[in-house]
């Protein structure tokens, strides 16, 4: 007798071993039809999995997160099946699930074309319509290697050969196609109705640039037609908001082949940068931070002490001078400890808060670079707080409150909070971890935040809070963080004199609110679709003349506004006013002021707000008050 416990705690008895599919069928035909897999004692399995002992079982359907994972995993194999049908000489390699979809890498004699993608997608739909069952079998490793070699699938054979010899491997078959996979999979191809192939890109075999360049086909798959359409619509909107496209259209920045992964800021883009930096500088000044500046080039021995040399060496730019090895800093924290160590520090000095707009460099692979959001050189609003364990709670509460205000000012209202707790491998006593985790959790509770716990996802040297922004089209961007660090003060011998007169190690809190300024500006551009709020816009007002006769008056208007600290563009060109209005509107300016003879005679301006809103004629003084109010309110 086998007893199955269901999620509602009800129990069902079966006379002998039973599959997940059979349990689903015994509950109801609707559930049997919807079943994609099961979770047996917490482990995700196929519907064909045989349960041979008393177990807890939940049936997984397309409504579950695990169900969507199964759909995407199986869709990757369906893609490989279709490619092998159409291009028999192609060799299959790997095909994992990724965020919102999947990909599969192929080796083929020529690049796949957009027309090929259309044909592959069509064949996938045909295979779905056939509703072919997906079956699993297990082979000894060496037998599996020989099997795939006999098929001419040498990449797959190489993967299997790297598995320990005493391990069996599982294969999944659908129709004529069989692939190596741990599984689980959906029960049949008919469960994979809602998918779309997105693009083809290059990818090196095993991620090594010394190996062959493969072709990676990306796709997306969803549980319903509506979800697929919503995702495709979101992608269309994201494309319109793409910061790389808007950066060019609005003349903000460019990336040049002469310096891959580094940003050339144009005058307007640098104005935005300065707006963000000066705002964050005031945040430092108003919240007890002392701004510091450390060198970019630091001796290798420092990075060896901190542990970065062992873990991040491949991502560091290095150089040699006078028989000494140096590295461009990938992060600012060691430099801040060196500043902290200058002079004796007392418990009365704590908490001591340092802030820096620190320029860092990381040798990111070319394929991972993405506009100004993923670069090799970036500047962080990097702060470090040196404090005692007892001070962690208050510092975290204050930091969260500050972060919320900053994000609100930049137009972000939706923040997701996560606490990453101790991993298995860690340093420090359990007592210290207890205090640190308690402080982080209580700081969020005190701030009125709902939050998630991410067990085991803290760093080996301390727990952290991650602050993730949700943007206008539902995408998530992890920006802010506050990280407790017990390790680095120990490694670099940072000390303070306690109230007892003895030497003590400070706790170090790593914190950043916007993180990389480059990335944050990219997020801002996409969040606002290029129409940055008035206080941050590179040009806040354009003054346009209708004819040459208003030129002198327009200059006076522009000068008056500039004297009030506004960023003003003056357009005196002898062009049609409709043309000029359209041109400046495309630059997404907050306000356009048109001056003709009537406005000049009245000492006024005709005001157009962004979005083609005609605010009518108003005095220059009234307009100045209006825009000043918008700026003050961060509108």
UniProtKB/Swiss-Prot annotation:
What GO CC terms are in its UniProt record? cytoplasm
Q: Which cofactor does it need?
A: Zn(2+)
Q: What is its main location?
A: cytoplasm
Q: Which UniProt keywords apply?
A: Aminoacyl-tRNA synthetase, ATP-binding, Cytoplasm, Ligase, Metal-binding, Nucleotide-binding, Protein biosynthesis, RNA-binding, tRNA-binding, Zinc
| InterPro entries found in the cross-reference section | aa-tRNA-synt_IIb (IPR002314), aa-tRNA-synth_II (IPR006195), aa-tRNA-synth_II/BPL/LPL (IPR045864), Anticodon-bd (IPR004154), Anticodon-bd_dom_sf (IPR036621), Beta-grasp_dom_sf (IPR012675), TGS (IPR004095), TGS-like (IPR012676)
Q: Which domain of life is it from?
A: Bacteria
> Which residue stretches belong to region Catalytic?
242-533
Q: Where in the cell is it found?
A: Cytoplasm
Catalytic reaction annotation: tRNA(Thr) + L-threonine + ATP = L-threonyl-tRNA(Thr) + AMP + diphosphate + H(+)
Q: How is the cofactor bound here?
A: Binds 1 zinc ion per subunit.
Q: What is its EC number?
A: 6.1.1.3
The reply to whether Transmembrane figures as a keyword in the UniProt entry is no
What residues bind Zn(2+), as annotated?
Answer: 333, 384, 510
- A biological process (GO) annotation for this entry? threonyl-tRNA aminoacylation
Q: Give the matching PROSITE patterns.
A: AA_TRNA_LIGASE_II, TGS
Gene Ontology molecular functions: ATP binding; metal ion binding; threonine-tRNA ligase activity; tRNA binding
Pfam families found in the cross-reference section: HGTP_anticodon, TGS, tRNA-synt_2b, tRNA_SAD
Gene3D superfamilies membership: 3.10.20.30, 3.30.54.20, Anticodon-binding domain, Bira Bifunctional Protein, Domain 2, Threonyl-trna Synthetase, Chain A, domain 2
What are the TGS domain coordinates in residue numbering?
1-61
Q: Which NCBIfam families match?
A: thrS
Q: What does this protein do?
A: Catalyzes the attachment of threonine to tRNA(Thr) in a two-step reaction: L-threonine is first activated by ATP to form Thr-AMP and then transferred to the acceptor end of tRNA(Thr). Also edits incorrectly charged L-seryl-tRNA(Thr).
Summarize subunit and interaction data from the UniProt record for this chain: Homodimer.
Member of which family? Belongs to the class-II aminoacyl-tRNA synthetase family.
Please identify the protein, giving its name as recorded: Threonine--tRNA ligase
Upper lineage: Bacteria, Pseudomonadati, Pseudomonadota, Betaproteobacteria, Burkholderiales
């Amino acid at each position: 007798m086998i007893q199955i416990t269901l999620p509602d705690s009800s129990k069902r008895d079966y006379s002998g071993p039973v599959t997940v599919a059979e349990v689903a069928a015994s509950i109801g035909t609707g559930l049997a039809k919807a079943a994609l897999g099961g979770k047996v004692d917490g482990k995700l399995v196929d519907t064909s999995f045989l349960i041979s002992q008393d177990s807890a079982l939940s049936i997984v359907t397309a409504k579950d997160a695990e169900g969507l994972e199964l759909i995407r995993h199986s869709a990757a194999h369906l893609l490989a099946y279709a490619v092998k049908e159409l291009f028999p000489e192609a060799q299959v390699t790997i095909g994992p699930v990724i965020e919102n979809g999947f990909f599969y890498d192929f080796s083929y004699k020529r690049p796949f074309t957009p027309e090929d993608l259309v044909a592959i997608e069509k064949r996938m739909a045909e295979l779905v319509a056939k509703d072919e069952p997906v079956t699993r079998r297990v082979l000894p490793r060496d037998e599996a290697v020989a099997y795939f070699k006999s098929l001419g699938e040498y990449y797959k054979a190489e993967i299997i050969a790297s598995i320990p010899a005493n391990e069996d491997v599982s294969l999944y078959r659908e129709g004529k196609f069989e692939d190596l996979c741990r599984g689980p999979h959906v029960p049949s191809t008919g469960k994979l109705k809602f998918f779309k192939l997105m693009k083809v890109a290059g990818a090196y075999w095993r991620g090594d640039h010394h190996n062959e360049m493969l072709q990676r086909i990306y796709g997306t798959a969803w549980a319903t037609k509506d979800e697929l359409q919503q995702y495709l619509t979101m992608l269309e909107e994201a494309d319109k908001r793409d910061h790389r496209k808007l950066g060019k259209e609005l003349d903000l920045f460019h990336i040049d082949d002469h310096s891959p992964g580094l940003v050339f800021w144009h005058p307007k883009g640098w104005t935005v940068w300065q707006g963000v930096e000066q705002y964050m500088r005031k945040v430092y000044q108003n919240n007890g931070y002392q701004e510091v500046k450390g060198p970019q080039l630091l001796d290798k021995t420092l990075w060896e002490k901190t542990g970065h040399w062992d873990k991040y060496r491949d991502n560091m730019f290095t150089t040699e001078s006078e028989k000494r090895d140096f590295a461009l800093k990938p992060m600012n924290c060691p430099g801040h400890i060196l500043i902290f160590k200058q002079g004796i520090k007392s418990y009365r000095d704590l908490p001591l808060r340092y802030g820096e707009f620190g320029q860092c460099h990381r040798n990111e692979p070319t394929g991972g670079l993405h506009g100004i959001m993923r670069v090799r050189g970036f500047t962080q609003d990097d702060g470090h707080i040196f404090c005692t364990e007892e001070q962690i709670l208050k510092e975290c509460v204050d930091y969260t409150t500050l972060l919320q205000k900053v994000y609100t000012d930049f137009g972000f209202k939706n923040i997701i909070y996560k606490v990453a707790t101790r991993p298995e491998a860690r340093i420090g006593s359990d007592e210290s971890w207890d205090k640190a985790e308690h402080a982080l959790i209580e700081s969020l509770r005190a701030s009125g935040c709902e939050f998630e716990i991410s067990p085991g996802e803290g760093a080996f040297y301390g727990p952290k809070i991650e602050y993730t922004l949700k943007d206008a089209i539902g995408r998530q961007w992890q920006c802010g963080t506050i990280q407790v660090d017990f390790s680095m003060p120990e490694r670099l011998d940072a000390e303070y004199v306690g109230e007892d007169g003895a030497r003590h190690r400070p706790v170090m809190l790593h914190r950043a609110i916007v993180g990389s300024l480059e990335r944050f500006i990219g997020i801002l551009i996409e969040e606002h679709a290029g129409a940055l709020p008035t206080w941050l816009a590179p040009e806040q007002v354009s003054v346009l003349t209708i004819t040459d006769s208003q030129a002198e008056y327009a200059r006076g208007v522009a000068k008056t506004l500039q004297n009030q600290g506004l960023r003003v563009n003056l357009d005196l060109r002898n062009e049609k006013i409709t043309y000029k209005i359209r041109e400046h509107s495309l630059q997404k300016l907050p306000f356009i002021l048109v001056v003709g003879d009537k406005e000049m005679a009245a000492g006024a301006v005709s005001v157009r707000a962004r979005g083609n809103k005609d605010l009518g004629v108003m005095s220059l003084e009234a307009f100045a008050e209006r825009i000043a109010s918008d700026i003050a309110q961060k509108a």
